[in-house]
Amino acid sequence: MVRAALVTATSLALTGAVVAHAYFLKHQFYPTVVYLTKSSPSMAVLYIQAFVLVFLLGKLMRKVFFGQLRAAEMEHLIERSWYAVTETCLAFTVFRDDFSPRFVALFTLLLFLKCFHWLAEDRVDFMERSPNISWVFHFRVLSLMVLLGVMDFLFVNHACHSIITRGASVQLVFGFEYAILMTMVLTTFIKYTLHTIDLQSENPWDNKAVYMLYTELFTGFIKVLLYMAFMTIMIKVHTFPLFAIRPMYLAMRQFKKAVTDAIMSRRAIRNMNTLYPDATPEDLQATDNVCIICREEMVTGAKKLPCNHIFHSSCLRSWFQRQQTCPTCRMDVLRASQPNQTPAPPAAQAPAPPAPANAPIPPPVNVAPGMIPQFPPGLFPFWGPFPGAPPPAVPGAPAAPTDTPQPSSDGAQGAESGAGGLAQSTAEAASAAPGAMPGFPFTMPPPFPSAPWLPMPPPPPFMSSMPPPPSSLSSMSEAELRELEQEGRRGLEARLQCLHNIHTLLDAAMLNIHHYLSTVATLSPPRSETNTGETSESANVESSPSTANTETAGQEIQSQSGESINGAAGFSQPDSTTEGEKDVKEEDEDDGEPSAAELRRRRLRKLETTNTPDHGNLLKLASVN
């Protein structure tokens, strides 16, 4: 108050000094006025004095029409005034060619009237929350609305007349602004009428919320049409009205909210009338029978929501006009009222016949003989994908040609066949080793080659070390056991840490098992059924007591080389092969796979052929001795 008085006194003193100085220089009225209008410092002082006078006039009108402003009304007024001043400055930039004292005066008057429109709207909304409304309040509100409506109509009429006579100018902006203010006055007057009717009735008016909702819907639609027409005309005749973007957006958002509220409220009220049951006297006695909306006791006409909260039907109807939630627990009544469609239970299937006691276990699908089946997917959900074992070699596939010359002697042939088998197994192991583990961007080196003299295959490459096992419960102290058993965060963390250690141990163990199985499958490729049968027969023949240890080793190497030779396509027999073996080979090629008798006869012939040079050497050694 003191600051406003000081500013008023200062501006008044400056204005008096400027006018006295101009009159002292010119000594006449007209030259003094011309001097004041041409001097920039004098015009600045006069502008300040004009703003002070407008401020004083506003305080006077506020005292007459509103009395003492409430804190919420003052806060809303200051908040909206800042936006209005910003939009006015943007309008100055758009109409900078029309900038003049008259232009500034018109915008100041527009801002002045906007402030009183906002105050009137807030004061009428206060009627719904005020229990006592005096006749002074009605007189002030009615007189203010009449004054604002008349002034808005006069300024709209003046703007239309100016546009028709002088063409499109800045009056286009003022005309649309005052038209929007007229819609605001209309909305305020309708709300005032509805609140007055509600206050005159003894019981609450149930349909007031419906009328207010449709009033906002109607006036919001008019505002949207006015802003769209204003934007279209301004873009065509002048430029893009940047200052009208924010109010236009607010008008559209308000209209959209009104449409949504109208639709959702009708749906909620329909659900209340059709789906929600009436509260029985037992329900009212079991709970508090005071409606929290109107704070009155519920005797009849109460509805029970899906959340078991009870309210007056009229209170719920007015509540659902604004929001579709329970007043107590804020549950969405529209979502809760949707019927829950439970799926029909499946038809009972006939029980499957019990399996026999000695039923054979079906073999796994797509697993070669001699291979260990892979783990089913999803057994260990925290694992990544691991490379599988290589597929077994197909018997009868063409072998890679070698440049090593074929020796003529039988001993050299046996040695070469043994070396070739070793090289071939090494190459297969190197090629079948996984190139890279999942999750590593670099390529892993191949595992160590298998050696016949090693009793066990080498360990798998890059095998992860086992984590330390968790401490035994018997070795834990009493404090640690109490920490595991206690309630709260520390106990929960201790139990989770113990479970995490067990989980880590299981993952590490299964990872090492998988590495071991992959390495074993890589180093020991499976054999076909024919080779398995031949190996068993050769083992029976070699187990005879008349064969020495050295002969047994030579027979194994020779049998392996003979099997690899017979299984390879396009291989020619050496010169030491007998005519009987050629006939047997031709019969096998004509008839397909040989029978068991043919295999036995072939093995015996090979043994005789292999043992003959050894007996000759023994006779030569005996004759020399």
From Swiss-Prot:
It is found in: Endoplasmic reticulum membrane. It is a multi-pass membrane protein. GO terms for cellular component: endomembrane system; endoplasmic reticulum membrane; endoplasmic reticulum quality control compartment. It is an enzyme of class 2 (transferase). One of its GO terms (molecular function) is ubiquitin protein ligase activity. Coiled coil: none annotated. Residues 342-361, 462-471 have a biased composition (Pro residues). A zinc finger (RING-type) spans 291-330. Residues 1-4, 62-98, 157-169, 236-625 are cytoplasmic. Its EC number is 2.3.2.27. Residues 26-40, 120-135, 191-212 are lumenal. GO terms for biological process: ERAD pathway; proteasome-mediated ubiquitin-dependent protein catabolic process; protein ubiquitination; ubiquitin-dependent protein catabolic process. Residues 423-434 have a biased composition (Low complexity). This is E3 ubiquitin-protein ligase synoviolin. It comes from Danio rerio (Zebrafish). The gene is syvn1.
